């Protein structure tokens, strides 16, 4: 783990970031009718294993099964009627796709969803369930973006970016507001990182409320571009990714990178075996089924890297963002059986 970054609450509002505490509070008011205020769970058994008090913000119980509905609904309900009339388009491997489809359905407008051919079946089914118009792409981010651009040009639909967008970031940040409203004494939050929309929103909100709070990212070893970016001081992309955490394969955007660079204190990298072990622990001790991307925060809290760091010694009450629960049960049981 590297040195702490970031300058706290004032910096979170004054350095020209895409979002701030004000846009996040506006998002909270805007999306309140359309999202769940998800529960915060705890387990004395898990606390004993980790050696700290953990508070799990369970976005696996969110509408569409993940935190993504926060950013999607904020983006879609922020559109004026003329902008919304031609619908919205996005590209996503799963959770954001379903969230956009659902938010568009709630707004009564069409949603064009570009999905890579390797997306998990359970997540594709969610998009269909919410009435999204699916357009397939190849698996690369370049293909996804190219197809989304073509659909946008053909339909006039507004792009709802999965992470690199002010309204998306602001919507995701509302999860941090809820967590700290319920457990204000939290001193560290561990957040999954991929494109950076969630952790950017969490960091901007949390550090505005409590400048001394620590924000840690959790990232899979097979898709550790954020850790490499943090070390290099610039955005690093990878030629390919290989991880069970299918929701954590995107790379940082130009709007999320400055927040990650400045306000994320450290990035903990864990392997897929650790993620599966954390999924099992969530199921056995929290009685909650979570997807790999949602379990990675617990995996990070259990890691030797964290326990050997100053962050572990300086933390007592740790928030864990359980980002989603859209897991293919067949994959879940196969993974748990192998462990």
Swiss-Prot record:
Its EC number is 5.1.1.18, 4.3.1.18, 4.3.1.17. Mn(2+) binds at residues 219, 223, 225. Ca(2+) 1 binds at residue 90. It catalyses: L-serine = D-serine; L-serine = pyruvate + NH4(+); D-serine = pyruvate + NH4(+). Gene3D superfamilies: 3.40.50.1100. Inhibited by semicarbazide, hydroxylamine, aminooxyacetate, sodium borate or phenylhydrazine. Racemase activity is enhanced by Ca(2+), Mg(2+) and is decreased by ATP, Cu(2+), Zn(2+). Hydratase activity is enhanced by ATP and is decreased by Ca(2+), Mg(2+), Co(2+), Cu(2+), Ni(2+), Zn(2+). One of its GO terms (molecular function) is magnesium ion binding. Ca(2+) 2 binds at residues 219, 223, 225. Mg(2+) 2 binds at residues 219, 223, 225. Optimum pH is 9.5 for racemization and 9.0 for hydration. Keywords: Allosteric enzyme, ATP-binding, Calcium, Isomerase, Lyase, Magnesium, Manganese, Metal-binding, Nucleotide-binding, Pyridoxal phosphate, S-nitrosylation. The modification N6-(pyridoxal phosphate)lysine is found at residue 68. ATP binds at residues 43, 63, 130, 287, 326. Mg(2+) 1 binds at residue 187. Optimum temperature is 35 degrees Celsius (racemase or dehydratase activity). CDD domains: Thr-dehyd (cd01562). Catalyzes the synthesis of D-serine from L-serine. Has dehydratase activity towards both L-serine and D-serine. Belongs to the serine/threonine dehydratase family. This is Serine racemase. It comes from Oryza sativa subsp. japonica.
């Amino acid at each position: 783990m590297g040195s702490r970054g970031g300058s706290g609450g004032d910096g979170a509002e004054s350095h020209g970031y895409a979002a701030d505490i004000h846009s996040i509070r506006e998002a909270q008011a805007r999306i309140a009718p359309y999202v769940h205020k998800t529960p915060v769970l705890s387990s004395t058994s898990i606390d004993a294993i980790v050696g700290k008090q953990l508070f799990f913000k369970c976005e696996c119980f969110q509408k569409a099964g993940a935190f993504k509905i926060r950013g999607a609904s904020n983006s879609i309900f922020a559109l004026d009627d003329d902008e919304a009339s031609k619908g919205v388009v996005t590209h996503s491997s799963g959770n954001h796709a379903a969230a956009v489809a659902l938010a568009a359905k709630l707004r009564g407008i069409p949603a064009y969803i570009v999905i890579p051919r390797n997306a998990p079946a359970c997540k594709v089914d969610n998009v269909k369930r919410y009435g999204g118009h699916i357009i397939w792409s190849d698996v690369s981010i370049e293909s996804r973006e190219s197809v989304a651009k073509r659909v946008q040009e053909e339909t006039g639909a507004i792009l709802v970016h999965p992470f690199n967008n002010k309204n998306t970031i602001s919507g995701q940040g509302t999860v941090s507001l809820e967590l700290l409203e319920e457990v204000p004494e939290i001193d560290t939050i561990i957040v999954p990182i991929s494109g950076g929309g969630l952790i950017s929103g969490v960091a901007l909100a949390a550090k505005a409320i409590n400048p001394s709070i620590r924000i840690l990212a959790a990232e899979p070893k097979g898709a550790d571009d954020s850790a490499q970016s943090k070390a290099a001081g610039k955005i690093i992309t990878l030629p390919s990714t290989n991880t069970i955490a299918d929701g954590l394969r995107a790379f940082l955007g130009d709007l999320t990178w400055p927040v990650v660079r400045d306000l994320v204190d450290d990035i903990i990298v864990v392997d897929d075996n650790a993620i599966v072990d954390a999924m099992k622990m969530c199921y056995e001790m929290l009685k909650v089924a979570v997807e790999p991307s949602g379990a990675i925060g617990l995996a990070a809290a259990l890691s030797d890297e964290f326990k050997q760091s100053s962050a572990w010694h300086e933390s007592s009450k740790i928030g864990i963002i359980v980002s989603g629960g859209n897991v293919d049960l067949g994959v879940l049981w196969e993974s748990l059986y192998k462990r």
